[in-house]
Amino acid sequence: MRRRFLIPALLTLVTSASACAAEPVRQDILGEDSVLAAAQGVWRSHESGWILEIDEDGITRWQDTPAACYPSPTDGPTLMGQIEYRYFTAISADTARFQYLPGDGHARFERLDALPAHCTANLDTSPQAVFDVFVSVFERHYAFFDARGVDWPAQVGTARRQLRGDMSEAELFDLLAGMIAPLGDSHTKLIAQIDGERRRAQFGLGDTLPRIDATLGETPWLIGLIQQTVTDVLDEDAQHIANDRIITGTIDDRVGYLQFFTMGGFVTEFEAGTPQWAAAELAALDTIMDEALTQFEGMDAVILDLSNNRGGYDAVCRSIASRFTDAPFLGYAVSVGNEPEPVARYTIEPAEGPRFTGPVYVLTSDVTVSCGEITTMMLRQLEHVTQVGATTRGAFSTPLAKPLPNGWYLELSNERFEDTSGTAHEARGLEPDIAIHPFPEDSPVAGHAAAIAAILADLDPR
């Protein structure tokens, strides 16, 4: 699962599932009365830098870095820092995959004889120790220094010369934030609590959102966009539904319209990140897509509007893609770290419910990020799909969570999402077939309606 949600924060979760023999056998780690015996022991993932220490009392997660190994709290400020593994799949006697949710993820763990000797709960929280862990985590796990044009060793050398043992927390935070700023990666962030104040360093948010924040303000802008779409663009039966995450309707009774603000967050009755939540999200999506695509049957085209999509749960993205194909296709592959081959490939099977395989237009912008980009990348591989709008953000990877020894919270990008040609679009985004900015500087609300009008104009000659 993944990414930053509009309201509230919701991130894609990642890990894995595989098998021990001909057929994978996934088992619950935490039963009602006991912890799965096969999962007990010490397990390490080099891909993610996590160690799981599992005994009859439950799971303790350790951060395993070249600079230090220490317990990882489960009360982080984002969902990726709060969730825990729930499922275990043996590959062999000494290797296994652990999952947060069924069907997502790919990190492989190897069994250790014992917790490594350098792992300790006695944390060194000095500026030097925190700096060393921060640097080592990036060196081991960050996947896009080259793609983002950053000379990390040079960054480290410059910052190390500024490091002092008597630095204040605020000074250290500024130093580390300055190191990640040149990456321009919105899936890489540093969050801290300093003197009772929450601080967040996150960069690479594109041009539109910072401009909107400095002028209209994001909330008034979104309200204006929603009112314009429902009142002026769509027919009278338009709906704003699914906990305000989706707009659905038609245009002139001949073009179907679906806008997703987030890929999840449709339900509120379950704790985010739990299996019950995941099942409810997909069930809610199925109901919405069944009704919408039944209404769209026989129409000239469908517009899938992801121009304001902030990402979400990867299974939702794959489920959406399954509604626009009549044949299986490879959606994408995921590689981690320096692995020469993808660790996971996702084939999209046609949905059992209603599908639409006429002309489909996917509307994007530099706000489109993460799972919104993955959906775009999958669909634009299909001949009947046209991407319209502006180039997407270029931040695909699920954030890898790394709490630092002093309690600060780091997330970074360690995965490469690749299309069927093996191309990763991280840092550059997905360029549209038809270029028109939905949120231009001189008309950030009206420009969205103009982009939809451009789609209709392209459709007419067809």
Give the positions of each predicted feature.
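Bacterial N-terminal signal peptides that target proteins for export
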Residues: 1-9
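Bacterial N-terminal signal peptides
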Residues: 8-17
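Flexible, low-complexity junctional segments that flank or bridge functional domains
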Residues: 21-302, 306-332, 401-403, 459-461
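Gly/Ser/Thr-rich loop/hinge elements
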Residues: 29, 311-363, 367, 398-403, ...
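Structural recognition of the beta-strand scaffold that forms the well-ordered cores
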Residues: 256-259, 302-305, 331, 359-364, ...
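Extended C-terminal subregions enriched in glycine
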Residues: 359-381, 386-393
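C-terminal soluble interaction/assembly domains
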Residues: 370, 380, 389-405, 410-412, ...
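Low-complexity, Gly/Ser/Thr/Pro-rich intrinsically disordered linker/tail segments
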Residues: 423-462
